[in-house]
UniProtKB/Swiss-Prot annotation:
This is Leucyl/phenylalanyl-tRNA--protein transferase. NCBIfam families: aat. It comes from Polaromonas sp. (strain JS666 / ATCC BAA-500). One of its GO terms (molecular function) is leucyl-tRNA--protein transferase activity. The lineage of its organism: Bacteria, Pseudomonadati, Pseudomonadota, Betaproteobacteria, Burkholderiales. Pfam families: Leu_Phe_trans.
Length: 255
């Protein structure tokens, strides 16, 4: 028999998280699982994100907290503007009825992310408790949305957490082709304009890898986090000039 993984600690409300080294490893049943329990309130979420921990659980499960190793991140200078996305983005920018908005419809965005069908996932981890928790985090000024609007309709977007000069991506949705990717491009432009070098993507997916995200050691991620999470946070607003950070800095890649 193989070695049994370390028991997962159950946290009472307000209890501190265990050291990240206590998280289950890559050969355990649930790599990255660190703890269960605690509360999904604003102070707990801020403490968690400040240490490189995030909640992720399905309906009917307790709150589960994760810190995977390796960690999937997008270095903002490595964002891949594929030729097809560049074409979609230029078309979007040329249409006066298309625009990017920040934080105008946060709850609509998170609920749209929850209902977005995803390959290999029969349900969603954005359960009602998570919607409520991140809506509270949004009202407190830490959770934000990037929204793609076309002719007055919300057609795509993402939501994230921002602490200092760290951005933690959470989920995306699209009701039109490339709508979520355009939102991500806007976020990357914002980050580049404000010297935010890394967007946390949490876990590896083929979709994120295709856009330039890659895995790094958790220790490197936590080191970068510690250096940036306490820095002065830039105002959460989008300026059209940020597109220059994308269109002039990027050479389009195939396809």
């Amino acid at each position: 028999m193989g070695k049994l993984p370390r028991p997962v600690p159950w946290l009472a409300a307000g209890e501190n998280f265990p050291p990240l080294e206590f998280a289950w490893g890559r050969h355990d049943p649930a790599p990255g699982l660190l703890a269960a329990g605690a509360a999904l309130d604003v102070p707990t979420l801020i403490q968690a994100y400040s240490r490189g921990i995030f909640p992720w659980f399905s309906l009917g499960q307790p709150v589960l907290w994760w810190s995977p190793d390796p960690r999937m991140v997008l270095h903002t200078e490595k964002f891949k503007l594929h030729r097809s996305l560049r074409k979609s983005l230029i078309h979007f920018l040329d249409d006066p009825e298309c625009e990017i908005k920040f934080d105008s419809a946060f709850e609509h965005v998170i609920k749209a992310c929850a209902s977005q069908p995803r390959a290999g996932q029969p349900g969603t981890w954005i359960v009602p408790d998570m919607v409520q928790a991140y809506s509270s985090l949004h009202r407190a000024g830490y959770a934000h949305s990037v929204e793609t609007w076309v002719r007055g309709k919300l057609v795509g977007g993402l939501y994230c957490v921002k602490l200092g000069r760290m951005v933690f991506g959470e989920s995306m949705f699209a009701h039109q082709t490339d709508a979520s990717k355009i939102a991500l491009a806007a976020l990357v432009g914002f980050c580049r304009a404000h010297q935010i070098a890394m967007i946390d993507c949490q876990q590896n997916t083929r979709h994120l890898a295709s856009l330039g995200a890659a895995e790094i050691d958790r220790a490197d991620f936590v080191r970068h986090l510690a250096q940036n999470v306490e820095k002065t946070t830039p105002p959460w607003q989008f300026e059209p000039v940020y597109w220059k950070q994308i269109l002039t800095a990027e050479k389009p890649t195939l396809p």
